[in-house]
Amino acid sequence: MNGDLGKTAITFGVFDLLHFGHFELFRRIRELVGESGKVYVMLQIDEMIAKYKPGCKSVYDFTTRQKMIETLRTVDKAIPYDVVGVEAVKDIGFDVLIVGPEHTNERFQRLFKWCAENGKEVVTLPRTEGISTTKLKEIIKDL
């Protein structure tokens, strides 16, 4: 799919404490869809982070995370979502779902099936080695 112009890609995440791994992900997605394509970031709302990741407190609230992501030239729009699934994406016009290797739970499996049934491509991109939000928070905590 490399450089397919005019395609729209989506990816899911919290994207708290933006770091090099996030920037690389967004850059790779932009590379895949081309400059005339669209990159939409499905950004999890605060209430669901607290529910699905107990004990994992966000540094930035949703509005701040959305503003930060939307200032990046590689991203066209950050869209709120509560839970990963068909309901979150069915009304969004997209061609490609971008996921990481860790996205294997049942919700993602149902979404992958829906994508296959609806002509949407699913692309798995590797994580950027050596960096993660969790690792960053641990480093900051130890300072």
Name each model feature, range by range.
Residues 1-143:
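Nucleotidyltransferase catalytic core that binds NTPs
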